[in-house]
């Protein structure tokens, strides 16, 4: 089966080459999710062409025009659509580029990231004209995106979803608002990279420092302030909190780092660097509050990345996280700063070898049962059933 996969996903090295020196590099979670799905489809025998609208803006790329080009990366052909990096024109240009590419590309099916509305609208429109199936990847409800909503964007994404013939969703709760016509769908939660090298059941520790880490959007809605305050309150001896990525909380965070040298802010980093840091850490924390409505509609992809590292995970009891995951993580029951402080102290009171085994079991679980080869095969089966 020949599949055109329309999104902003770039090959990892191509992405790094374009953005590694940019002070405002695009978010990498969507990049990683789509790239893993693309690679999984290809490894399962599909002939995949990634139809990519590179995520450039006036603030992260000085070039006003990027020409189209195609490159082969392993089993995947990346077709980078041309970019006219001019506000007010860029989105229309991307839509037309994706439309033409898919319309005349000869694919058997289209898969698209519906939240990347410009490339998705072009791709799904071309698929409908060619009477080909189009699967929409829905990783968030457009109305509830924590990064902000634009009503025109919400309406366009809703229109794209209506045009799709099936869906890939992260939680069962998403099905009702996304799929009122009861079209075929699969739940994949998140994707674990099948190429990850498993960590040993008990790690070799070369430092007495207890290194905590958070890598995600720095937003109070994500519980970051409560986490930082909780870490400071916990006052665990010989402990550090390392924080990556960016967001509106960054100014306040930098003030905290001046008062508390063991809170260390690294800024934006490429995902490979973040993953290496996760492997080297002693505890990975996800403080996302459970009361926010969006949490029941999305699986925390950060938890998947955390669990895949083999490092133990401390997370809130998110409604979008199925029960089968919870035996592999430590849970924050009280999401206040005081509650997070208690959870951190309780976790570090656990024998280190036991914490290591918890992290090892989590990695084994996601590598064996939630890897991108297994999950993408389910998507391919849905397409082949049409």
Q: Where do the model's predicted regions map?
A:
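A charged, aromatic-enriched C-terminal amphipathic alpha-helix characteristic of glycosyltransferases
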Residues: 335, 352-384
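Conserved donor-binding/catalytic core segment of Leloir-type glycosyltransferases
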Residues: 2-6, 168, 204-231, 242
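Nucleotide-sugar-dependent
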Residues: 222, 272-277, 286-305, 315-323
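Donor nucleotide-sugar binding/catalytic pocket of nucleotide-sugar-dependent glycosyltransferases
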Residues: 143, 157-199
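N-terminal subdomain of nucleotide-sugar transferases
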Residues: 1-63, 166, 229-234, 318
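Membrane-proximal helix-turn-helix segments that form the acceptor-binding/catalytic region
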Residues: 34-39, 99-104, 118, 125-129, ...
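Conserved acidic donor-binding segment of nucleotide-sugar-dependent glycosyltransferases
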Residues: 329-338, 345-352
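Nucleotide-activated donor-binding/catalytic signature segment of Leloir-type glycosyltransferases, i.e.
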Residues: 251-278, 283
């Amino acid at each position: 089966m020949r599949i055109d996969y329309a999104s902003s996903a770039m090959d990892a090295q191509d992405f790094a080459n374009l953005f590694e020196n940019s002070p405002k590099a695009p978010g990498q979670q969507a990049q990683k999710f789509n790239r893993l799905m693309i690679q999984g489809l290809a490894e399962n025998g599909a002939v995949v062409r990634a139809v990519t609208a590179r995520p450039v803006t006036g603030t992260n790329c000085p070039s006003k025009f990027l020409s189209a080009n195609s490159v082969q990366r392993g089993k995947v052909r990346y077709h980078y659509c041309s970019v006219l990096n001019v506000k007010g024109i860029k989105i229309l240009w991307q839509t037309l580029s994706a439309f033409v590419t898919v319309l005349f590309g000869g694919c058997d099916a289209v898969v698209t990231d519906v939240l990347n509305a410009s490339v998705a609208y072009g791709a799904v429109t071309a698929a409908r004209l060619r009477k080909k199936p189009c699967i929409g990847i829905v990783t968030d409800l457009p109305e509830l995106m924590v990064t902000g909503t634009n009503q025109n964007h919400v309406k366009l994404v809703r229109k794209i979803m209506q045009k799709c013939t099936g869906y890939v969703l992260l939680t069962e709760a998403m099905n009702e608002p996304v799929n009122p016509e009861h079209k075929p769908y699969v739940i994949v939660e998140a994707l674990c990279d099948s190429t990850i090298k498993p960590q040993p059941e008990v790690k070799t520790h070369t430092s007495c420092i207890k290194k905590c880490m958070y890598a995600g959007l720095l937003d109070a809605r994500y519980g970051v302030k409560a986490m930082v305050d909780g870490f400071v309150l916990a006052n665990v001896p010989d402990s550090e909190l390392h924080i990556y990525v960016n967001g509106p909380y960054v100014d306040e965070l930098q003030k905290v780092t001046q008062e508390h040298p063991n809170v260390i802010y690294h800024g934006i980093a490429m995902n490979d660097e973040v993953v290496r840091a996760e492997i080297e850490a002693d505890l990975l924390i996800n403080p996302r509050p459970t009361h926010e409505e969006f949490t029941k509609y999305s699986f925390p992809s950060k938890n998947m990345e955390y669990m895949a590292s083999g490092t133990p995970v401390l997370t809130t009891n998110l409604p979008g996280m199925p029960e089968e995951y919870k035996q592999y993580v430590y849970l924050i029951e009280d999401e206040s700063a005081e509650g997070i402080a208690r959870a951190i102290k309780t976790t570090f009171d656990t024998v280190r070898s036991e914490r290591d085994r918890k992290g090892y079991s989590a990695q084994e679980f996601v590598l064996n049962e939630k890897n991108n080869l297994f999950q993408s095969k389910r998507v391919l089966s849905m397409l082949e059933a049409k």
